[in-house]
């Protein structure tokens, strides 16, 4: 393998950009996240908030109110908001998968984790040491750092797929036999056991994603303050800026 090919492979595995980081102090900012990626991130974040809040009330509904059902449509509105957010979440995920093939190489990091590359795991360990306060300075990355890359695929993406499958399976039950939701996702229910099992796993999945979001927000803010490059502002402007 040529030196150039080896360098490119290591760069892809570690998130190092030869044009931005290796040139050192002469480069202070580089364009990373394209507009579709940034739009997806914030719309997806809003959808997750709506899904979590409405999902909680669907699982633990408020006390019954007196009067006619037609005059108290609160749960109807909650369910409607949940279904709309679910469609936005699912369609957004399909769009994000498409953009991984149409966008720049940073847009593919969410779905491409070089787990068979030694350099990648060295960088993962390095980031784990930094998050555990065992090292004073993290490495510099242009796209997702290697640990974030692992978490985004194996924790966020796979759990999102699970939530979409189980969610639409339950939706298909309500839409009745013969609906496209039931035809496409009806197989999920017998796979997991029965309808109540799907409800339980979907509910647990919600809390799993809530915990991930909390850790994700903490890690992003912490790295923005203590790390060597911008994080939060990068998902707004698209540009990664370096502090040193």
UniProtKB/Swiss-Prot annotation:
UniProt keyword annotations, A-Z: Cell membrane, Electron transport, Heme, Iron, Membrane, Metal-binding, Plasmid, Transmembrane, Transmembrane helix, Transport
PROSITE patterns associated with the record: NI_HGENASE_CYTB_1 (PS00882), NI_HGENASE_CYTB_2 (PS00883)
> Which biological process terms from the Gene Ontology are attached to this UniProt entry?
respiratory electron transport chain
Output a single Gene Ontology CC term carried by this record.
Answer: plasma membrane
Q: Which SUPFAM superfamilies match?
A: Transmembrane di-heme cytochromes
Q: What topology does it adopt in the membrane?
A: Multi-pass membrane protein
Family label: Belongs to the HupC/HyaC/HydC family.
Question: What does this protein do, in the record's words?
Answer: Probable b-type cytochrome.
What is the protein's name according to its record?
Answer: Probable Ni/Fe-hydrogenase B-type cytochrome subunit
**From which organism does this entry originate?**
Cupriavidus necator (strain ATCC 17699 / DSM 428 / KCTC 22496 / NCIMB 10442 / H16 / Stanier 337) (Ralstonia eutropha)
């Amino acid at each position: 393998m040529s030196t150039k090919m080896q360098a490119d492979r290591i760069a892809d595995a570690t998130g190092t950009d030869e044009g931005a980081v290796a040139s050192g102090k002469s480069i202070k900012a580089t364009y990373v996240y394209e507009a579709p990626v940034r739009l997806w991130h914030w719309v997806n974040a809003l959808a997750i908030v709506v899904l979590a809040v409405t999902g909680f009330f669907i699982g633990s509904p408020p006390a019954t109110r007196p009067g006619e059902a037609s005059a108290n449509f609160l749960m109807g509105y909650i369910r409607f908001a949940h279904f709309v957010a679910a469609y936005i979440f699912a369609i957004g995920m399909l769009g994000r998968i498409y953009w991984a093939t149409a966008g720049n190489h940073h847009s593919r990091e969410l779905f491409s984790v070089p787990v068979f590359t030694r350099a990648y795991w060295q960088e993962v360990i390095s980031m784990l040491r930094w998050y555990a306060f065992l090292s004073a300075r993290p490495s510099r990355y242009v796209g997702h750092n290697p640990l974030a890359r692992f978490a985004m695929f194996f924790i966020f993406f796979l759990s999102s797929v699970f939530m979409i499958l189980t969610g639409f399976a339950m939706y298909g039950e309500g839409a009745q036999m013969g609906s496209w939701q039931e035809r496409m996702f009806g197989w999920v229910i017998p796979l997991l056991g029965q309808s109540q099992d799907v409800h339980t796993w979907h509910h647990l999945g919600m809390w799993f994603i809530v915990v991930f979001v909390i850790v994700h927000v903490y890690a992003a803010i912490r790295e923005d303050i203590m790390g060597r490059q911008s994080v939060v502002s990068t998902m707004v402007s698209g540009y990664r800026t370096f502090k040193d």
